Amino acid sequence: MGIGAGESCDPYKTFPIREHHEQVLRDLIARDKNHPCIVMWSMGNEPDTEHFPESAYDYWHSLYEFTHRLDPQNRPVTFVCCQNNYEKDIVTRTMDVVCLNRYYGWYNLSGDLEAASYAWNLELDFWEKQNKPVMITEYGADAVAGIHECVPEMFSEEVTNWEQL
């Protein structure tokens, strides 16, 4: 193994954040448990659950159970997954609600909307088989300010001009 590889880079074993994460969840739920707008608890945003799947599972699933124990109303618990290989991700499928940040055709399969649509549908088929509710929590595209094209192209401001759609 080289530098920056292997077990020593496993963020779930390297960084001592578990106690802090639990305290943040305690504070969040104690503060907001009676707020009428709370429909579920999100424990995090875009964690890497793909590269160290067993460690990620141990970390997130135990926090999932911890969060459920804290909430007297037993609302759904989740986190938001981003761009992880959904077939390798053994954590997201254990959440009560599958929350996905996805950018098919932008960060994945850039500019190839036909391939992006196909890949997105494959992923949706996968999640449907998990028998969990799915929420698309982010989607979209980006532009570089000042780049203009007659026909909307990637990175031009026109590609993100939703008024033209």
Where in the sequence are the language-model features?
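Active-site mouth of glycoside hydrolases
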Residues: 1-109, 115-133, 143-165
